[in-house]
UniProtKB/Swiss-Prot annotation:
One of its GO terms (molecular function) is nucleic acid binding. This is UPF0102 protein VIBHAR_00890. HAMAP family: UPF0102. It comes from the Bacteria. Belongs to the UPF0102 family. InterPro entries: Restrct_endonuc-II-like, tRNA_endonuc-like_dom_sf, UPF0102_YraN-like.
Amino acid sequence: MGLFSKRQIGNQYETLAKQYLQRQGLRFLDQNFLTKVGEIDLIFQQGETIVFVEVKYRKNDSFGSAAEMVTRAKMRKLVKTAQIWLSQQKRSAYNIDYRFDVVAIHDSGRDINWIQNAISEG
């Protein structure tokens, strides 16, 4: 096993993604929102839109890109978890703009790809 746990490595890349998105002008709202259904890594606001962010990282693309790691099951969990977060914030998914983005990180953080509207609810 390596020097760092999977969670520590995940936190490191989430921090990198958070800093990257803040530099892009997004306003940070929440991190590691956890429910029985699932977890959302980062939550931001861009203008009037709430942005739920899944952070994925890969050492290399040998087994696919980081963005390809977001499965259909994961997408469903993200949507349900986002609805819970919105409800706790007294916001309705029916009258607020929101989207799901992926920040894909490769090459130990030297390559960051921000994919907006990466996940659909369908």
